[in-house]
Amino acid sequence: MADGEEVSALVCDNGSGMVKAGFAGDDAPRAVFPSIVGRPRHQGVMVGMGQKDAYVGDEAQSKRGILTLKYPIEHGIVTNWDDMEKIWHHTFYNELRVAPEEHPVLLTEAPLNPKANREKMTQIMFETFSVPAMYVAIQAVLSLYASGRTTGIVLDSGDGVTHTVPIYEGYALPHAILRLDLAGRDLTDYMMKILTERGYAFTTTAEREIVRDIKEKLAYVALDFEQEMQTAQNSSSLEKSYELPDGQVITIGSERFRCPEVLFNPALIGMESAGIHETTYNSIMKCDVDIRKDLYGNIVLSGGTTMFPGIADRMSKEITALAPSSMKIKVVAPPERKYSVWIGGSILASLSTFQQMWIAKSEYDESGPSIVHRKCF
């Protein structure tokens, strides 16, 4: 590195479904790839083919026919550290093509991430990757920063988990955070199920990816579910066609809005939990009465599963029905919300005031992994 050159920090948002990684100061992540590690099902048959012992991300996805695929992050929380290390290695060396020992690294974590997990992340960064400095930030807090706020409640829904996180003056309020194990992956499963009922069978992991694409391209949230069902029954105005990779064209109608309806009515997939609107309301009600007004007026959506058209209007309608009648309710759905956690990290890591917040290697050497609880909150 030249002396005068500013070293850019790396920002890595590890989601259950996708890793988003890039450089602080950029307006979007450079690398976005599936959080998957695949290992060969069979010993290498073809000698000299240079078969790797593990594949990560897109390469694992494309070779899935011969691999066993695993997601090291379940419901937002890292459960398999060996595979997680492979994902980070792939992120630094193959995707971003940087030497981690030359850049500070900002990582993200799920709300209510166990303490031992934060320590393990910290340890791997300093000991395996020899980073000069690092920081761990809560995902929902970064999304709120990305929306230009420091107070509000974030509904963050990704592939593996959904959280409602009330934040006041930049600090998440842990006692009021609620977690819902219902997210994008479950919606894809449900879409597979209701398409099967229509006579289109999707079963394999490869076909699941097709259904995910159908969901992302065609699904939307109905403002009034019952009325939408009536419309779907009486006319074909809501029907859309989709071309499968083999050229076959399928038609879908009510499935388009029945799929994301699960977010508001988890009973549709046999879950007893409250929907996202009620969970948001319950989260607000766990907060001090004095700050509720600020939360109702700043409900920020974040994550890929909040990308359905119509979700903000429906959310607004449902919360209005639950809240006190005089309350002003505002649901904010930033267009870039699929990546707002990463964007918030990019903003935070490039602030001059943040530079004293990094955990330096010297501090880690002195205090060990527990330093993370003192410096990151």
From Swiss-Prot:
One of its GO terms (molecular function) is hydrolase activity. Pfam families: Actin. Its EC number is 3.6.4.-. One of its GO terms (cellular component) is cytoplasm. CDD domains: ASKHA_NBD_actin (cd10224). Belongs to the actin family. This is Actin. It comes from Coleochaete scutata.
